[in-house]
Swiss-Prot record:
RuBisCO catalyzes two reactions: the carboxylation of D-ribulose 1,5-bisphosphate, the primary event in carbon dioxide fixation, as well as the oxidative fragmentation of the pentose substrate in the photorespiration process. Both reactions occur simultaneously and in competition at the same active site. SUPFAM superfamilies: RuBisCo, C-terminal domain, RuBisCO, large subunit, small (N-terminal) domain. It is found in: Plastid, Chloroplast. Mg(2+) binds at K192, D194, E195. It comes from Drosera filiformis. The modification N6,N6,N6-trimethyllysine is found at K5. The basic functional RuBisCO is composed of a large chain homodimer in a 'head-to-tail' conformation. In form I RuBisCO this homodimer is arranged in a barrel-like tetramer with the small subunits forming a tetrameric 'cap' on each end of the 'barrel'. This is Ribulose bisphosphate carboxylase large chain. One of its GO terms (cellular component) is chloroplast. Keywords: Calvin cycle, Carbon dioxide fixation, Chloroplast, Disulfide bond, Lyase, Magnesium, Metal-binding, Methylation, Monooxygenase, Oxidoreductase, Photorespiration, Photosynthesis, Plastid. Binds 1 Mg(2+) ion per subunit. Its main location: plastid. It is an enzyme of class 4 (lyase). One of its GO terms (biological process) is photorespiration.
Length: 466
């Protein structure tokens, strides 16, 4: 005989190990597993562990040349999901040696590379990862982080204000630069390239970079405040992306931008290293995230993509607005917002946090709230996100009836009023609309904005949907 037992394997014999004690160096994953009818949860959980680590579908003789026990993933715990029939959370532990140091790309290729097409599963979703500190220490992380950014910009004690320049496609570079200048001059801290503004026939990247740099220097000189515009360096090749970042650095601007999911983690990590080495802040847009994270039972939850971004590197990341969205999102959104900002986050299933995660001093990332928000949302946003955030009003600035500078001024007045009210002990949740109305009395720009957009009902109680 050949000295080993040939044939197709029963995964749970090898990969389901409920007695396993997880190691501090293991990467832990929580998967939401929906097995095919007739497949027991232990077999499904074990199949996930096998297929995302050392397993293959049949016994191979080269298994004898390695130590499976040292390298295999293990499904160490399975629990049913309450309220769902035939859905389970399977916890899998991976030995650290399965992963290349400092590579988010390799981590994802291993953990989610193959297993999502597995026949024994009807659906699979990666809900959370626990990254061991020994692995985190192999990553640079964000180029600068929250504190360094505040020091660079000299802005403290309040959220930062931004605005995406619209219409996002079709403006010439000169007109685009004009809109940037007007918004910054009116009181915003940042303006932003849209995620799909790269280098198109109507506006090549170099022209846009030049006119935007001119705009922000002019606004800076006139306001005495440091200004920034997120210059989108995303490109078709890594070389071209770095070329654009180099040009931004030569212009002396403070910040560039990248679409990290469409651009890819390898490109993103390269750009983050360049940004730290050259003093550029890095704004991250999450275009394509909903392709991965929108389905409740299949895909990857955004908190995992957020964790991965903190490892790969970025100083800002878009993370939803909470207001005006579905109920139940508030606690879960704040779960991954804190995961981005804080140095340590405690396991809390009510917020979707499956594992306690220490970040061992990796810099934090500022969450960016953007999309469909306006001056009436300001108290809610200030209350929910706190000071360490970027609030972005695209239409909420450029849609002002008097033009861009008054639109920017209205947002700045609303923000300063909310911060002042909060610091004086007022309850933003209950008195929010009143605070905005009072501020509008001495700001015609805000008063006009208040008439265009409607007051919102700010209801805190959320139906959690874990």
């Amino acid at each position: 005989g050949v000295g080993f037992k040939a044939g197709v394997k029963d995964y749970k014999l090898t990969y389901y190990t409920p007695e396993y004690q997880t190691l501090d160096t293991d990467i832990l994953a929580a998967f939401r597993v929906t097995p095919q009818p007739g497949v027991p949860p232990e077999e499904a959980g074990a199949a996930v562990a096998a297929e995302s680590s050392t397993g293959t579908w049949t016994t191979v003789w080269t298994d004898g040349l390695t130590s499976l026990d040292r390298y295999k993933g293990r499904c160490y715990h399975i629990e049913p999901v309450s309220g769902e029939e035939n859905q389970f959370i399977a916890y899998v532990a991976y030995p650290l040696d399965l992963f290349e140091e400092g590579s988010v790309t390799n981590m994802f290729t291993s953990i989610v590379g193959n297993v999502f097409g597995f026949k024994a599963l009807r659906a699979l979703r990666l809900e959370d990862l626990r990254i061991p500190t020994s692995y985190i220490k192999t990553f640079q992380g964000p180029p600068h982080g929250i504190q360094v950014e505040r020091d660079k910009l000299n802005k403290y004690g309040r959220p930062l204000l931004g605005c995406t320049i619209k219409p996002k496609l079709g403006l010439s570079a000169k007109n685009y630069g004009r809109a940037v200048y007007e918004c910054l001059r009116g009181g915003l801290d940042f303006t932003k390239d849209d995620e799909n503004v790269n280098s198109q026939p109507f506006m090549r990247w170099r022209d846009r970079f030049l006119f935007c740099a001119e705009a922000l220097y002019k606004a800076q000189a006139e306001t005495g405040e440091i200004k920034g515009h997120y210059l989108n360096a995303t490109a078709g090749t890594c070389e071209e992306m770095i070329k654009r970042a180099v040009f931004a650095r030569e212009l002396g601007v403070p910040i560039v931008m990248h679409d990290y999911l469409t651009g890819g983690f390898t490109a993103n990590t390269s750009l983050a290293h360049y940004c730290r080495d050259n003093g550029l802040l890095l704004h991250i847009h999450r275009a394509m995230h909903a392709v991965l994270d929108r389905q409740k039972n299949h895909g990857i939850h955004f908190r995992v993509l957020a964790k991965a971004l903190r490892m790969s590197g970025g100083d800002h990341i878009h993370s939803g607005t909470v207001v005006g969205k579905l109920e139940g999102e508030r606690d879960i959104t704040l779960g991954f917002v804190d995961l981005l900002r804080d140095d340590f986050i405690e396991k809390d299933r009510s917020r979707g946090i499956y594992f306690t995660q220490p970040w061992v001093s990796l810099p934090g990332v500022l969450p960016v709230a953007s999309g469909g928000i306006h001056v009436w949302h300001m108290p809610a946003l200030t209350e929910i996100f706190g000071d360490d955030s970027v609030l972005q009003f695209g239409g909420g600035t450029l849609g002002h009836p008097w033009g861009n500078p008054p639109g920017a001024a209205a947002n700045r007045v609303a923000l300063e009023a909310c911060v002042q009210a909060r610091n004086q002990g007022q309850d933003l949740a209950r008195e929010g609309n009143e605070i905005i109305r009072r501020a509008a009395k001495w700001s015609p720009e805000l008063s006009s904005a208040c008439e265009v957009w409607k007051e919102i009902k700010f209801i805190f109680e959320a139906m959690d949907t874990l």
